[in-house]
Amino acid sequence: MRRFFGTDGIRGVVNEDLTPELAYKLSRAIVGYFGNVKGKKVIIGSDTRNSKDMLKSALVAGFTSGGMNVLDVGVISTPALSYLVKNQDEVLLGVMISASHNPVEYNGIKIFKNDGFKLDDDVEAEIENYLLKEDNYYRANPREIGVIYDFSHIKEKYKNYLREIINGNFEGYKVMLDCAFGSLSEIAPEVFRELGAEVVAYNTKYNGLNINENCGAVYPETSKKLFLNSGAHIGFTYDGDGDRVIAFSENGEIIDGDIMLGILAKYLKEKGLLKGDKIVGTIMTNLGLEEYLKNINVELIRTKVGDRYVLDEILKYGLNLGGETSGHIILFDYMSTGDGLLTSLFLLKILKEKGVKLSELAKDIKIFPQVHEKVSVKGLNITEDMEKRFIEITEEVINGKNIRYIVRKSGTEPVVRITLEGDVPKEYLNELVLEIKSRIIDLLSNF
């Protein structure tokens, strides 16, 4: 069992789980794993949270002591960093400092290979082994210690790429953006404006402490209020590192990742561009989307929660579209990771091309009611037997009714997540999920 890497890199509460000492040891372990890194380049970027500088300094110390040069791109989205790592010459790795949608108390470290993909599980496990060993790894002589370069200018390369994909303009459209005080606070409004849209941007003045704070993709109902006051034709709300997006139709309907997947799948299929007539979702993907896809002769492949697992299935089957309910959408013809900005631009491109409103594209996708709860398990070792008991409790409460359930330990937070879904009133699902939560809490109180 891995101690540090979860489903999305290393993540935890800053100065408790994720310390500068750990960040330094990680970069030294990477030096140890890759061996001769003298003169190699690593791109480092971050979201806007205040702990970024502390963690970046620690990482830089480890890399430069091994002779690596650091290209500091500053505040950037995770997908933009992934793209730049792949498209910048002589780069060995990319490192993103971010805890994505989590509150400011958290931060994380994600590592990308120079092909733009996150590290494989087995490589992460090997790096953990190096991290746990005594640091006897290469240290450069004083004349060969690495240096830091300000490379914030290469973000323009990513912006240019997005404009090439859209290959048009959005003149006549008014767009609302909730940037969650995160990585897209500057670049998202810039790109939409450069493409001719009128932009109303909220939550862009970050201060290091307000990322994801009652805003962004984690709080769509709050964003919806901003949208309804904006007078915009369409709205998009992002998370802290810009790898997910939730949209709003012209009447304020929340368009989540499942509905966006349905819209994108139909568009690509109509164009003859949907590879394999299949898309990838997760165990959380709504049954309503699956029914819709069947009606347009598209197969849904389900996998574990996490965009890395969605990507694994895309690669396995040679597909080009996948995503999660939360708004991680992978348009694999263009990007190797979820990209909130690309997804929002692509949706607006479809609207303009078809000359319709977003509600018209979404109306045939009936999303079944779904409710979520979570139970804190911080400090507890959740065994397989305990997880089985959680499922038994859930089945006892559901009592044979036609309701789909998911009970799983989170890969990014110390919580157990409970999801119920069915073609029944949401109020009824809420009653059931709260009963399940209460029984699981009672069970955990004995440990």
From Swiss-Prot:
Tell me the cofactors it needs: Mg(2+)
Q: Which UniProt keywords apply?
A: Isomerase, Magnesium, Metal-binding, Phosphoprotein
Question: Carries keyword Metal-binding?
Answer: yes
| Catalyzed chemical reaction(s) | alpha-D-glucosamine 1-phosphate = D-glucosamine 6-phosphate
Signal peptide position in this chain? none
The record's GO CC annotations read: cytosol
Residues bound to Mg(2+):
S100, D239, D241, D243
Q: Where is the active site?
A: S100
EC nos: 5.4.2.10
Which Pfam families does the protein's record reference? PGM_PMM_I, PGM_PMM_II, PGM_PMM_III, PGM_PMM_IV
- Write down the NCBIfam families for this protein, in alphabetical order: glmM
What's the protein called, per UniProt? Phosphoglucosamine mutase
Source species of the chain? Dictyoglomus turgidum (strain DSM 6724 / Z-1310)
Q: What gene does this protein come from?
A: glmM
